[in-house]
């Protein structure tokens, strides 16, 4: 036993392993599962202590792309750019989104767009239905024929239906209507235009470069100074002498002999025929027609001409007094008249210039016998306007053809209406509306007359086509 070596205790290796001089052993490594994907470690760049990194949720919209659907480019807080597709969310016009939803969606990446309605876009379908509904009632009430009723589509060129409705209403409600130098056909034509304009205004239909009434409000300025008249250019008209020869049997010749015996005489012309020679010392013409002969106009003329300047100014004063009597509280009607610009042959929507005048011819007519009436015996103010100023303005076809005279090469019609009857047509249409439509009378806006080169007198007609179904012309 004495020669056997001494055995060391078994706890010594353990104490040696756990001594503070050596670090503790690492735990055994576990094997990774094959189905587990470990993302690659991204080393963030070292930042300066003075730089505070932004949150990844912070973003800034750089710009929007106008594609369909729309996109927007945003920049994240970490500097990366992202293209985001905008999703269309329709929000009703009357529904206001709550503030809570806006706060909740402000931090999300989903963009919200509102559907904004363009106020300039007119709902044509609903306007057409509204106008057709009213016209169906009027056509049924005033006995429009079934063929015309079926063909009516509420189009601008279908003014004949409005004219027939007005004619039937006049026969039933205003029988025996008195007119002054106005034909019944022209009066109902103008009433039909005013009615069509009111129906279109009621329905909400608007036209571009076209006025349904064919009229304008003209600030003539012919009553400001005594003896001074102004043409459609707005310039002062020139006074010159005029000698006219007309046939004895014509309408103009007989009227001249009856109304102006001191200025007319019957002579024989160079062909030996008896004619009525009329000499006017107070004729007025446009400044562009000073060098032109009788019944001749330059290519820059407005076509306005008066054989007697004094009679024309009396007619303008009559219309001014007539409007003052009918509308005593008017604010903007002084020295303005309602002028029909387009007769039947000019009332075309293509607006192609015709040969001759491009506006209705304006002629002053004398009211024979009006000067014999006493103002003390008449109490009606509108009638007193004609007694004090016994002349009226008459609007005729742009290129009229008189009886027993040679026809002109341009288009013509029998359009003829006086200035007071133009106002009467507008007044009767307003009465018609109040009697037949429950809705209030819409506000009719008649444009103000402004001179344009399109209204110049045309001595040469533009070439026009007549249509052809063939593909090749030759």
UniProtKB/Swiss-Prot annotation:
Q: Where is this region: Flexible loop?
A: 244-278
Instruction: Show the GO cellular component annotation of the record.
Output: host cell nucleus; viral capsid
Annotated region (Disordered), positions in chain: 1-34
Q: Where in the cell is it found?
A: Host nucleus
In this chain, Zn(2+) 1 is annotated as bound at 231, 233, 286, 302
Main localization (coarse): host cell
Which family is this protein grouped under?
A: Belongs to the adenoviridae E2A DNA-binding protein family.
| Protein's UniProt name | DNA-binding protein
Q: Which organism is it from?
A: Human adenovirus F serotype 41 (HAdV-41)
């Amino acid at each position: 036993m004495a020669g056997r070596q001494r055995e060391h205790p078994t706890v010594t290796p353990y104490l040696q392993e756990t001594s503070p001089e050596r670090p503790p052993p690492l735990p055994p490594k576990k094997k990774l599962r094959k189905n587990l994907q470990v993302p690659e470690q991204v080393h963030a760049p070292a930042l300066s202590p003075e730089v505070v990194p932004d949150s990844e949720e912070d973003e800034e919209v750089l710009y929007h792309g106008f594609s369909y659907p729309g996109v927007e480019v945003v920049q994240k807080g970490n500097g990366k750019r992202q293209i985001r597709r905008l999703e269309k969310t329709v929000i009703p016009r009357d529904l206001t989104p709550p503030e809570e939803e806006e706060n909740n969606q402000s931090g999300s990446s989903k963009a919200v767009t509102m559907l904004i309605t363009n106020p300039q876009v007119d709902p044509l379908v609903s306007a057409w239905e509204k106008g057709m509904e009213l016209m169906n009632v009027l056509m049924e009430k005033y006995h429009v024929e079934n063929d015309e009723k079926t063909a009516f589509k509420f189009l601008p060129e279908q003014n004949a239906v409005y004219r027939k409705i007005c004619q039937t209403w006049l026969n039933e409600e205003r029988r025996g209507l008195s007119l002054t130098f106005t034909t019944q056909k022209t009066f109902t034509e103008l009433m039909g235009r005013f009615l069509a304009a009111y129906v279109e205004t009621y329905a909400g239909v608007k036209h571009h470069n076209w006025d349904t009434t064919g009229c304008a409000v003209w600030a003539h300025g012919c009553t400001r100074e005594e003896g001074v008249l102004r043409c459609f250019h707005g310039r002062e008209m020139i006074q010159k002498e005029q000698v006219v020869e007309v046939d004895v049997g014509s309408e103009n010749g007989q009227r001249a002999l009856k109304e102006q015996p001191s200025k007319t005489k019957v002579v024989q012309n160079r062909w030996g025929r008896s004619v009525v020679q009329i000499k006017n010392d107070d004729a007025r013409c446009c400044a562009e027609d000073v060098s032109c002969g009788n019944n001749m106009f330059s290519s820059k003329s407005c076509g306005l001409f008066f054989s007697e300047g004094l009679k024309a100014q009396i007619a303008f004063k009559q219309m001014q007094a007539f409007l003052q009597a009918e509308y005593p509280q008017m604010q903007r009607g002084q020295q303005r008249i309602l002028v029909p610009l387009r007769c039947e042959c000019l009332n075309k929507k293509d607006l192609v210039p015709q040969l001759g005048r491009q506006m209705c011819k304006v002629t002053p007519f004398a009211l024979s016998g009006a000067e014999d009436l006493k103002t003390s015996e008449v109490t009606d103010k509108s009638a007193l306007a004609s007694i004090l100023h016994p002349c009226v303005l008459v609007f005729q076809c742009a290129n009229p053809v008189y009886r027993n005279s040679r026809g002109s090469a341009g288009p013509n019609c029998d359009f003829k209406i006086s200035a007071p009857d133009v106002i009467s047509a507008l007044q009767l249409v307003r009465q018609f509306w109040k009697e037949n439509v429950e809705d209030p009378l819409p506000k009719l806006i008649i444009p103000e007359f402004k001179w344009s080169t399109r209204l110049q007198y045309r001595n040469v007609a533009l070439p026009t086509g007549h249509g052809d179904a063939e593909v090749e012309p030759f």
